[in-house]
Curated annotation (Swiss-Prot):
Proton-dependent transporter of monocarboxylates such as L-lactate and pyruvate. Plays a predominant role in the L-lactate efflux from highly glycolytic cells. Interacts with BSG; interaction mediates SLC16A3 targeting to the plasma membrane. Residues 429-446, 446-470 are annotated as: Basolateral sorting signal. The gene is Slc16a3. It catalyses: (S)-lactate(in) + H(+)(in) = (S)-lactate(out) + H(+)(out); pyruvate(out) + H(+)(out) = pyruvate(in) + H(+)(in). It comes from Mus musculus. InterPro entries: MCT (IPR004743), MFS (IPR011701), MFS_dom (IPR020846), MFS_trans_sf (IPR036259), Proton-linked_MCT (IPR050327). Belongs to the major facilitator superfamily. Monocarboxylate porter (TC 2.A.1.13) family. GO terms for molecular function: lactate transmembrane transporter activity; lactate:proton symporter activity; pyruvate transmembrane transporter activity. The chain crosses the membrane at residues 18-38, 62-82, 85-105, 110-130, 150-170, 180-200, 232-252, 268-288, 299-319, 322-342, 356-376, 392-412. The keyword Chloroplast does not apply. Residues 1-17, 83-84, 131-149, 201-231, 289-298, 343-355, 413-470 are cytoplasmic. This is Monocarboxylate transporter 4. Disruption phenotype: Deficient mice are born at normal Mendelian ratio, with no apparent defects at birth. However mice exhibit impaired exercise endurance with abnormal neuromuscular junctions innervation and lower compound muscle action potential amplitude. The modification Phosphoserine is found at S430, S469.
Length: 470
């Protein structure tokens, strides 16, 4: 991709794997929690919005849809901003946008205005926080990156369990307008998290001002060269197919229980079970992925997590009572947590640190399309058949397909491809090929010595340096 470029500074910065990285992890935990839980948490205000504006449930549901679409669909824009201005400034602006959108929504007089404020402005603000926080986390952690990603991903279920009751409490005491205003103030904490994202600085030589190591070539604002990487292409296709069905069961499981005659309170408790299991599944999956013997096979572990999730959906379609749905939510929470902990760790392992900011933006854009297709397609299938199990079968089939795409694509297209020829001197030396004569050529050391000493005019000038003299 042509156009403007930005220099990100010196190379050779080693991930500290701790230190200030724990503060970055804490900030990423909070940002991930807000980003994923907020679109679901605002749903507690939907009934009051329906009464206020005289609209239907489908009209209010667009608020969450627009929030998710902005979170996923603005990925490339976030990548450009991060590569141009850096993570911390982008997150500070994003925190202001997220707060401003909710504060402005508290003064809205129509649902369209809420779409623009809560949906577009707050959604954009959360997107400008979510992606840079992941980029900073992956710059601060290398050896401990899997467990760091798992702990950060745990912010989603933790905040979901906290924000939904908080939203209900605010609505009961202050109404939806007061609740939106207070939530807007709460989102200013994103700016605090942005302040924690301290850029890594290259080490200095002898206290001087010159950074150690070579300068990195200027980086494109949006690096489309990732599409030349077969590993990235396979990951992007698999992730897009996965998202078609991944979010469908949590959307429909409560209605599925109510359709069986389960009371509303018990039906809603299913999501609490799912979220509680998810809290522990994510860091556990990150810890397992970080083990030395497991980490080289993280792509296959991610494929297994997707397969596990799809298989759980298929078995959940056979549930006939509340107990069956409880068992489904337990296993779905485990598999869902594994997927959440591994998805960005695997992407980072595929594309590397330098291309991660562009890669994650492009992947989120592709997933945005799938997010807008998946749950609505499940709803249309439900309207046509009136049978919930078909919705779960469709979701399971989509996630299973994505796991097979990743597994087979990685095994046949990546795992078995020939290793490229070694061109770097350091790599050549490690392969013991440096200065190694062909097998069929014999070398007489006496003739070589005579040639160098007696006939220098045929050989050119011989220069002795401390590095070449023995």
């Amino acid at each position: 991709m042509g156009g403007a470029v930005v220099d990100e500074g010196p190379t050779g910065i080693k991930a500290p794997d701790g230190g200030w990285g724990w503060a970055v992890l804490f900030g990423c935990f909070i940002i991930t929690g807000f980003s994923y839980a907020f679109p679901k948490a605002v749903s507690v205000f939907f009934k009051e919005l329906m009464h206020e504006f005289g609209i239907g449930y489908s009209d209010t549901a667009w608020i969450s849809s627009i929030l998710l679409a902005m979170l996923y669909g603005t990925g490339p824009l976030c990548s450009v901003c991060v590569n141009r201005f850096g993570c911390r400034p982008v997150m500070l602006v994003g925190g202001l946008f997220a707060s401003l959108g909710m504060v402005a929504a508290s003064f809205c007089r129509s649902i369209i205005q809420i779409y623009l404020t809560t949906g577009v402005i707050t959604g954009l603000g959360l997107a400008l926080n979510f992606q840079p926080s992941l980029i900073m986390l992956n710059r601060y952690f290398n050896k401990r990156r899997p467990i760091a990603n798992g702990l950060a991903a745990a912010g989603s279920p933790v905040f979901l369990c906290a924000l939904s009751p908080l939203g209900q409490l605010l609505q009961d005491h202050y109404g939806w307008r007061g609740g939106f205003l207070i939530l807007g103030g709460l989102l200013l904490n994103c700016c605090v998290c942005a302040a924690l994202m301290r850029p890594l600085v290259a080490p200095q030589v002898g206290g001087g001002t010159e950074p150690r190591g070579p300068q990195r070539p200027p980086q494109r604002l949006l690096d489309l060269s990732v599409f030349r990487d077969r590993g990235f292409l396979i990951y992007a296709v698999a992730a897009s197919i996965m998202v078609l069905g991944l979010f469908v069961p949590p959307v429909f499981v409560v209605s599925y229980a109510k359709d069986m005659g389960v009371p509303d309170t018990k039906a809603a408790f299913l999501l609490t079970i799912l979220g509680f299991i998810d809290i522990f599944a994510r860091p556990t999956a990150g810890f397992i992925t970080g083990l030395k013997k497991v980490r080289p096979y993280s792509v296959y572990l991610f494929s297994f997590a997707m397969f596990f999730n799809g298989f759980t959906d298929l078995t959940g379609s056979t549930a006939t009572d509340y107990g069956g749905l409880v068992v489904f939510c337990i296993f779905f929470g485990i598999s869902y947590g594994m997927v959440g902990a591994l998805q960005f760790e695997v992407l980072m392992a595929i594309v590397g640190t330098q291309k991660f900011s562009s890669a994650i933006g492009l992947v989120l854009l592709l997933e945005a399309v799938a997010v807008l297709i998946g749950p609505p397609s499940g709803g249309k299938l439900l309207d046509a058949t009136k049978v919930y199990k078909y919705v779960f079968i469709l979701a399971g089939a989509e996630v299973l397909t994505s796991s097979l795409v990743l597994l087979l694509g990685n095994f046949f297209c990546i795992g078995k491809r020939k290793r490229p020829e070694v061109t770097e001197p350091e790599e050549v030396a490690s392969e013991e090929k440096l200065h190694k004569p062909p097998v069929d050529v014999g070398v007489d050391s006496r003739e070589v010595e005579h040639f160098l000493k007696a006939e220098p005019e045929k050989n050119g000038e011989v220069v002795h340096t401390p590095e070449t003299s023995v």
